């Protein structure tokens, strides 16, 4: 939904008059959660309602201000270390055991068939993926480590069995096992598919550039399937008899991101591919609401020869499933079944269909739990699922045994404790449909969550029309907002209190629902898993929860700085050039709107190489630097360069493909700086080729 936030601000939909809110002491947590129930139960005049909302907004601004005064912005923990254990990935080890990844706790866990934890092993570098080879070796990868760890299972415990070095790689986001002990790994930062032979003298057999935002990889017989989130594509590669990656066999390309897929080989050698993603249609903002961003599942068939073809597609948002990330495909006896659960909603679907037929699937719907990030079919017919939102593993009974709900197995970690209940509620508002519970999928209207456009809080690779004039903008990350105000490219939201109020309005726009609404917890029983036991959650409590979450929804640790404490010679020169040419706008501040928070040059390395990487690299002013069309009459608010490498495409209008392209376009003199469209003026100069590489190397660290 914070398509809402990112789009509203970037796009410039001013939903309410900007106000300066008073700064007094915040109300108590319990008062916030109970606020406004009485007034909603009693008739009020419009003036009374307006007064109540204004008073609530003052209290919310108060709450934010008090938290801001108490916050050490240099040491605000990265989000990947402050939101619980985060069960994230699963793989089958043998008939009685599974292995899983706790992304938040950065650990590998051994599980029994009931998903009870038998062993936990810490993994350096933020564990994210696990794969089991045909011989039973277990490999685990981390987002900020250039090595894979290998374990062997002795029947009771996982035993360390060495590691595989991957020089030149910042980290791995996904893993799959291949024939003959080979591995396939996706490097998110480099956008590469690595073919690895752990037993070889040169373990990296090939590093192939595949595209932007690779998030998952799976081998299906002699085919390898890769999901490129930011390129909005799923690619099918051929594998030779030795398991080496060959030619691209097929590509599915959509207008928006594909969040997950599954695939199965049919008896006649055809590949059945199921993909889950946003509606294959441009985002439509022309009517004020977020149009054509429903969640869909798509079914494709790839014959042994010839091109891939779509069999059918189904809008699952209208059936109650939003942002499905882990579709699970079953094929048996000439029939197919697709299990789909949403990350952003509390329903699941079973779609029954003939594997080669374009006929619509028969749909069976069931209540479920939100937050599903991974799913794995078990020999028992049960389904094991990873649920970072609820910080739990889930075990769904086998098909036909739905009298019992899914079993919830909570997971905790001392080093990454669960967030406060209020903050967890805010996380649910961000990642589920709670912020706009009455949206529909009628016409171009959509049921969505913030994550529909901001995958895991970052971006979706889109450049979309704002619905205003001829302004097109790239999606912006929604992490790190607390110290980066005024918010968004138009800078119309002075603080998170204003942001939260506007987001409830824009998220539900078009649903004819008053954005000042309450939630009855009986309609969302899973809220109890977050520690929410209030019978009713009033509008102020909901906004406060969203603010509390956004305050701590910081950026993850930058993989480029892990294990380091100083610049290379190239990065040092880049830092000096940045200070001379860029830092007057992209200031080294810990709070973008507080000039006094800027760090001196000699303090940059310590801040950059810290786990927090807290410098915002922004300021609160508007600038006109040639990146057009401008989103505001005064230009565009200076954007944050924090984790610039995680955002693609670059610039507000998405016109730069790489960071070095962004740097090479720059033209400047002692008083002026243009990112694009510089006037033909001989006094303006560009960075030299060496300087451009040096500045880019520095930007990679931010």
Q: Positions of the model-derived regions?
A:
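Predominantly soluble domains enriched in secretory-pathway, periplasmic, or organellar proteins
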Residues: 4-433
């Amino acid at each position: 939904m914070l398509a809402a936030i990112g789009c509203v601000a970037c796009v410039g939909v001013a939903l309410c008059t900007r106000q300066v809110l008073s700064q007094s002491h915040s109300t108590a947590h319990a008062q916030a959660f109970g606020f406004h129930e009485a007034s909603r139960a009693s008739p009020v005049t419009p003036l009374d309602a307006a007064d109540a909302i204004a008073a609530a907004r003052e209290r919310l601004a108060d709450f934010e201000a008090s938290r801001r005064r108490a916050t050490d912005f240099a040491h605000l923990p990265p989000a990947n270390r402050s939101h619980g254990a985060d069960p994230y990935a699963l793989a089958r080890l043998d008939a009685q055991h599974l292995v899983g990844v706790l992304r938040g706790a950065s650990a590998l866990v051994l599980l029994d068939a009931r998903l009870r934890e038998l062993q936990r092993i810490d993994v350096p570098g933020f564990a994210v993926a696990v794969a089991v080879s045909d011989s039973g070796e277990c490999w685990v990868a981390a987002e900020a480590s250039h090595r894979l760890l290998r374990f062997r299972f002795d029947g009771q415990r996982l035993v360390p069995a060495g590691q595989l070095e991957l020089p030149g790689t910042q980290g791995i986001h996904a893993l799959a096992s291949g024939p003959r002990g080979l591995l396939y790994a996706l490097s998110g930062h480099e956008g590469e598919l690595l073919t690895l032979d752990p037993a070889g003298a040169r373990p990296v057999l090939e590093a192939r550039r595949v595209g932007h935002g690779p998030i998952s990889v799976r081998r299906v017989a002699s085919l390898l399937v890769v999901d490129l989130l930011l390129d909005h594509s799923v690619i099918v590669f051929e594998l030779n008899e030795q398991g080496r990656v060959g030619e691209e066999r097929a590509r599915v390309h959509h207008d928006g991101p594909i969040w997950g897929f599954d695939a199965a080989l049919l008896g006649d050698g055809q590949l059945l591919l199921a993909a889950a993603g946003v509606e294959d249609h441009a985002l439509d903002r022309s009517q004020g609401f977020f149009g054509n961003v429903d969640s869909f599942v798509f079914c494709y068939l790839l014959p042994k020869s010839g091109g891939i073809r779509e069999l059918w597609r189904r809008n699952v948002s209208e059936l109650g499933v939003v942002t499905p990330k882990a579709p699970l495909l079953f094929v048996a006896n000439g029939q197919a079944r697709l299990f789909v659960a949403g990350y952003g909603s509390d329903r699941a679907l079973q779609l029954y269909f003939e594997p080669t037929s374009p006929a619509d699937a028969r749909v069976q719907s069931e209540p479920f739990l939100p937050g599903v990030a991974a799913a794995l079919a078990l020999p028992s017919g049960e389904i094991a699922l990873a649920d970072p939102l609820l910080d739990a593993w889930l075990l769904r009974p086998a098909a036909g045994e739905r009298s019992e709900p899914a079993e919830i197995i909570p997971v905790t970690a001392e080093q990454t404790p669960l967030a406060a209940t209020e903050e967890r509620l805010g996380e649910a508002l961000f990642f589920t449909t709670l912020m706009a519970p009455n949206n529909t999928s009628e016409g171009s209207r959509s049921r969505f969550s913030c994550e529909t456009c901001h995958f895991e809080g970052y971006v979706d690779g889109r450049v979309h029309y704002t619905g205003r004039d001829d302004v097109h903008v790239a999606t912006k990350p929604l992490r790190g907002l607390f110290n980066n105000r005024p918010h968004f490219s138009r800078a119309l939201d002075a603080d998170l209190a204003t942001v939260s109020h506007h987001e409830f309005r824009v998220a539900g726009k078009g649903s004819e629902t008053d954005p000042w609404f309450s939630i009855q917890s009986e309609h969302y029983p899973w809220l109890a898993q977050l520690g929410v036991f209030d019978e009713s959650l009033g509008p102020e409590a909901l906004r406060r929860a969203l603010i509390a979450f956004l305050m701590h929804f910081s950026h993850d640790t930058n993989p480029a700085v892990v294990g380091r404490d100083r610049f290379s010679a190239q990065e040092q020169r880049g830092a000096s050039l940045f200070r001379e040419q860029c830092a007057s706008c992209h200031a080294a501040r810990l709070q973008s709107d507080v000039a006094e928070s800027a760090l001196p040059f000699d303090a940059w390395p310590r801040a950059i190489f810290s786990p927090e990487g807290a410098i915002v690299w922004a300021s609160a002013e508007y600038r006109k630097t040639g990146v057009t069309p401008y989103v505001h009459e005064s230009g565009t608010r200076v954007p944050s360069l924090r984790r610039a490498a995680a955002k693609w495409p670059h610039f507000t209008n998405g016109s730069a493909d790489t960071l070095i392209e962004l740097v090479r376009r720059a033209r400047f003199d002692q008083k002026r700086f243009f990112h694009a469209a510089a006037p033909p003026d001989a006094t303006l100069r560009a960075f030299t080729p060496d300087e451009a590489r040096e500045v880019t190397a520095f930007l990679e660290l931010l």
